[in-house]
Amino acid sequence: MKNIRNFSIIAHIDHGKSTLSDRLIQMCGGLSEREMQAQVLDSMDLERERGITIKAQSVTLDYKANDGETYQLNFIDTPGHVDFSYEVSRSLAACEGALLVVDAGQGVEAQTLANCYTALEMNLEVVPVLNKIDLPQAEPERVAEEIEDIVGIDAMDAVRCSAKTGLGVDDVLEEIVKRIPAPEGDPDAPLQALIIDSWFDDYLGVVSLVRIKNGSLKKNDKIKVMSTGQTWGVDRLGISTPKQKDTLALNCGEVGWVVCGIKDIHGAPVGDTLTLAKNGAESALPGFKKVKPQVYAGLFPISSDDYESFRDALEKLSLNDASLFYEPENSTALGFGFRCGFLGMLHMEIIQERLEREYDLDLITTAPTVVYEIVQTDGTIIHIDSPSNLPAINNIQELREPIAECNILVPQDYLGNVITLCIEKRGVQTNMVYHGNQVALTYEIPMAEVVLDFFDRLKSTSRGYASLDYGFKRFDAADMVRLDIMINGERVDALAIITHKDNAPFRGRQLVEKMRELIPRQMFDIAIQAAIGNHIIARSTVKAMRKDVLAKCYGGDVSRKKKLLNKQKEGKKRMKSVGRVDVPQEAFLAILHVGKDN
């Protein structure tokens, strides 16, 4: 056990975590030259295309150190996006240390800070690493000072390396062996194994990634899942080197995968504890705090025949992604579907894309909303995540919206732009600290404004230099209203949104205009209205297509023309009373993008 080192790699987006992982694998001979490829751990197609890490991946390597001993390194490559920070905290729970990778050109960013504090709260040893020192704009001295100044850990002797060229990577390995403590635990105690992650394999069933805290786990052991009490036999177990490699046992302190032939998707939830069926441990390990979804949206299959396969796909995906929440929902406009909860807009995009790709589904998404807290007139408090669940206005005593605390790091040159953006998003500044050339801002901004497009706007106003980290703070009373879109006098439930009263007329006009462009012309006029309750605040009309009924009258008497025109009018009127308007697919998507173009 004294030769095992468990650590995670944490960093801001694009600071070179996955490339550093590649080098570590290469130096320790985890894969042959032929199998090596760039970002070998980002195995999903989506990850490769977008160049981001979405799932944390674990690897076990053997490293022969300078002191002549061979060490077993178990490391986990983690995502950098704020939407996937729960993946990071889960990975850290399985480790004794973390490599804090900082880009020597860019310096400390908000996500570096957030992840580092998570690691320090869990009492992990944090080893700073300055990456990308081969770049001409690298300033390792300044960045080391910045780490000490902003993060508050000693960084003067931080390892300098370039993961791309492989320079200094052996120093990183030596630092890991020297500074990160060996795992604690009792090999003779009853087995306690923490499930860090699980995924569904079509042939093996549920595969779980576990960290053995106490005891050891062997092939053919009978094990028990502590939360459900079910028992299973261990069919296979092993380590990833990143290839799956079978072993006969996992010992105390190791990280590996286990297959027990569990077919039920909820058989081994993430954060649960495995123990032996006979003489097992009494108590479970402390799991992870459940993450609450911040954004909710309705997902509906385009053809209702896909509903069953959509449900199966969601079940399989939620096993792999512990923070996805879903419940059935039906809508008069879109039929049966699910109300899903996500951690942010990127998370929502990724999930939708994974469902469409990996499970061949065609989906429609409704406008995303956050969770609102409502005090009803009888004093009861309810939480709603969908505009259609909003009670009638005379039953609401107070409507409270969620406020997010945002930590923004920005270079001084862009400070003005960022402050203007925060004010536009109804933000309130609570703190501002200067660190050299960087400014750390703390704002309280309504969650609805943050999740929609705040991140994109922040990046564009600061030319990509500002970085953001946010978390839920509290609920505050606010003047919010439900904005309905009516088409020919009928409310379309899937188009309703909840918005601030001051923005409502503007949002209403924008939506109505957008709808007018997207709804195809019919044989009769279509009225598109935006309404708050019974009060119409915006309207536009899709004009009818009409036939020129006077074409065959040359000259002729005016009464003859009137007769033909009136006959046409009557027909249109009759048509309007029976005609139905189908809202096209694009109209639902347009709601998501309204307000981004201006």
Curated annotation (Swiss-Prot):
GTP binds at D14, H15, G16, K17, S18, T19, N131, K132, I133, D134. GO terms for molecular function: GTP binding; GTPase activity; guanosine tetraphosphate binding; ribosome binding; translation elongation factor activity. Its EC number is 3.6.5.n1. Required for accurate and efficient protein synthesis under certain stress conditions. May act as a fidelity factor of the translation reaction, by catalyzing a one-codon backward translocation of tRNAs on improperly translocated ribosomes. Back-translocation proceeds from a post-translocation (POST) complex to a pre-translocation (PRE) complex, thus giving elongation factor G a second chance to translocate the tRNAs correctly. Binds to ribosomes in a GTP-dependent manner. GO terms for cellular component: plasma membrane. It catalyses: GTP + H2O = GDP + phosphate + H(+). Residues 2-184 form the tr-type G domain. This is Elongation factor 4. HAMAP family: LepA. The keyword Plastid does not apply. InterPro entries: EF-4, EFG_III/V, EFG_V-like, EFTu-like_2, G_TR_CS, LepA_C_sf, LepA_CTD, LepA_IV. It holds the Pfam family GTP_EFTU. It comes from Tolumonas auensis (strain DSM 9187 / NBRC 110442 / TA 4). Belongs to the TRAFAC class translation factor GTPase superfamily. Classic translation factor GTPase family. LepA subfamily. It is a peripheral membrane protein. The keyword Cytoplasm does not apply. Its main location: membrane. GO terms for biological process: positive regulation of translation. It is found in: Cell inner membrane. Keywords: Cell inner membrane, Cell membrane, GTP-binding, Hydrolase, Membrane, Nucleotide-binding, Protein biosynthesis. NCBIfam families: lepA, small_GTP.
